[in-house]
Amino acid sequence: MADIMDIKSILYTEKSLGLQEKGVLVVQTAQNVTKNQLKEVFKTYFGFEPLKINSLKQEGKVKRFRGKLGQRKSFKKFYVKVPEGASIAALGA
């Protein structure tokens, strides 16, 4: 069972702000969270069931730091279709 703490943040980018107007929330989570676990988190903590959930893994970019190769952290993000009238004030959206 996933916990509310597995949701790291809501992503605020130009694309995600445009999607928010259409009722889609973009959430960054731990890499081991599944769609069904995220659905249970929304049911338990926010009181509604998402209409649709899409997921993707974002691999960390390989970057140079002081002449050596390093890699940014990889993460998983979900596009969550929220029903009309549902509120998720606990996450700040």
From Swiss-Prot:
Keywords: Ribonucleoprotein, Ribosomal protein, RNA-binding, rRNA-binding
Keyword presence, rRNA-binding: yes
Top-level division of the source organism's lineage: Bacteria
Pfam family, one: Ribosomal_L23
One GO term describing the cellular component: ribosome
Keyword match Cell division: no
GO BP terms, alphabetized: translation
Functional note: One of the early assembly proteins it binds 23S rRNA. One of the proteins that surrounds the polypeptide exit tunnel on the outside of the ribosome. Forms the main docking site for trigger factor binding to the ribosome.
Assembly behavior: Part of the 50S ribosomal subunit. Contacts protein L29, and trigger factor when it is bound to the ribosome.
Family assignment from sequence similarity: Belongs to the universal ribosomal protein uL23 family.
UniProt name for this protein: Large ribosomal subunit protein uL23
Organism name: Helicobacter pylori (strain G27)
Organism phylogeny: Bacteria, Pseudomonadati, Campylobacterota, Epsilonproteobacteria, Campylobacterales
